[in-house]
Design a protein with these regions (language model features):
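Short active-site neighborhood of thiol/selenol oxidoreductases, capturing the structured segment around
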Residues: 7-31, 35-37
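Thiol/selenol-based redox catalytic cores and closely related redox-interacting motifs
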Residues: 77-133
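Extracytoplasmic
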Residues: 12-16, 48-53, 63, 107-110
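Structural microenvironment flanking redox-active thiols in thiol-disulfide oxidoreductases
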Residues: 32-81, 88-94
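Short beta-turn/strand-loop junction motif enriched in small, turn-promoting residues
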Residues: 3, 42, 99-101
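Non-globular targeting/processing and membrane-anchoring segments
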Residues: 1-6, 135-144
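Second-shell loop/turn segments in exported
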Residues: 19, 23-27, 55-58, 80-81, ...
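Soluble non-cytosolic domains of exported or imported proteins
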Residues: 20, 27-31, 62, 85, ...
Length: 144
């Protein structure tokens, strides 16, 4: 919706986090990754609000808030799933923090990151993780 947010504050609210990197003009892996996240969100049912889902744009020059909003709508993404963009430097910094940076966006690989809570280690799923695999990692993170 165009509001400025700080990623650390967004993902450190105590909820488990599910995160990936996408860009809206991608025609290869981004649509399937986004579809899979939508399936995960749907299958979470009543637990959906207990998980912070974040998709970070790796193409901030093109991915405006409006473009990301339209992209999210196309996949049925709903709160608390957020799509983030920012400066090129901020996008690169976040990608590097997750060891996911590729100088050429066309060369980016499908990665999924999950974390139970602030201070906990991140789980990294390399490749196009399917909804059952993501849910198998995520559901235990929801247990008390």
């Amino acid at each position: 919706d165009g509001k400025a947010v700080a990623l650390p504050e967004l993902i450190d609210d105590g909820r488990p986090v599910l995160l990936n990197f996408i860009y809206t003009s991608c025609t290869a892996i981004c649509p399937p990754m986004t579809r899979i996240f939508a399936e995960v969100q749907d299958k979470l049912g009543a637990d959906r609000a207990r998980v912070r889902i974040v998709s970070v744009s790796i193409d901030p020059e093109e991915d405006t808030p409006k473009r990301l909003r339209d992209y999210a709508r196309q996949f049925g993404a709903a709160e608390p799933w957020v799509f983030l963009t920012g400066s090129s430097a901020a996008s690169e910094s976040v990608q590097k923090a997750f060891n996911a940076y590729r100088p050429d966006k066309m060369g980016h690989t499908p990665l999924t990151f999950l974390r139970r809570a602030p201070g906990q280690p991140w789980v990294r799923l390399d490749g196009l993780a399917q909804a059952p695999q993501i849910l198998a990692e995520l559901r235990p993170m929801l247990a008390p």
